[in-house]
């Protein structure tokens, strides 16, 4: 079982989701199954089948989270001295040299990556292009949308 890097925040989020799924959602689903079962014939009971499917998804996610937590290698960058180098868990302020757009990404593990929240998987094209670079470096990153040029404006360990 290979260890997977995860930030302290990412691990905490997974633990919170696990508690929610076990203590809140699981009892709600059991109640929905019980309610649907009381309606009679289970073969043509859409409510029952929908609740059972939701139960399957919920239990699958619980298993998945337990596996992620078991494999977690927590990296807490707040306990490291910041030398301006982009590392796993660091927050990076960038300027797109082609458009002038400023953007901030946090470099994270695969199980916590979320582009909408600007959480970038360290093995993604952008993550690989930034890891090991330093504040004020100019970087050229090959993305699916083409080559992008950035300047690293700041690197924070938060």
From Swiss-Prot:
One of its GO terms (biological process) is regulation of DNA-templated transcription elongation. One of its GO terms (molecular function) is RNA polymerase binding. InterPro entries: GreA/GreB_C_sf, TF_GreA/GreB_CS, Tscrpt_elong_fac_GreA, Tscrpt_elong_fac_GreA/B, Tscrpt_elong_fac_GreA/B_C, Tscrpt_elong_fac_GreA/B_fam, Tscrpt_elong_fac_GreA/B_N, Tscrpt_elong_fac_GreA/B_N_sf. Keywords: DNA-binding, Transcription, Transcription regulation. Pfam families: GreA_GreB, GreA_GreB_N. The keyword Transcription regulation applies. It comes from the Bacteria. PROSITE patterns: GREAB_1 (PS00829). SUPFAM superfamilies: FKBP-like, GreA transcript cleavage protein, N-terminal domain. Necessary for efficient RNA polymerase transcription elongation past template-encoded arresting sites. The arresting sites in DNA have the property of trapping a certain fraction of elongating RNA polymerases that pass through, resulting in locked ternary complexes. Cleavage of the nascent transcript by cleavage factors such as GreA or GreB allows the resumption of elongation from the new 3'terminus. GreA releases sequences of 2 to 3 nucleotides. Belongs to the GreA/GreB family. This is Transcription elongation factor GreA. It comes from Pelagibacter ubique (strain HTCC1062). The lineage of its organism: Bacteria, Pseudomonadati, Pseudomonadota, Alphaproteobacteria, Candidatus Pelagibacterales.
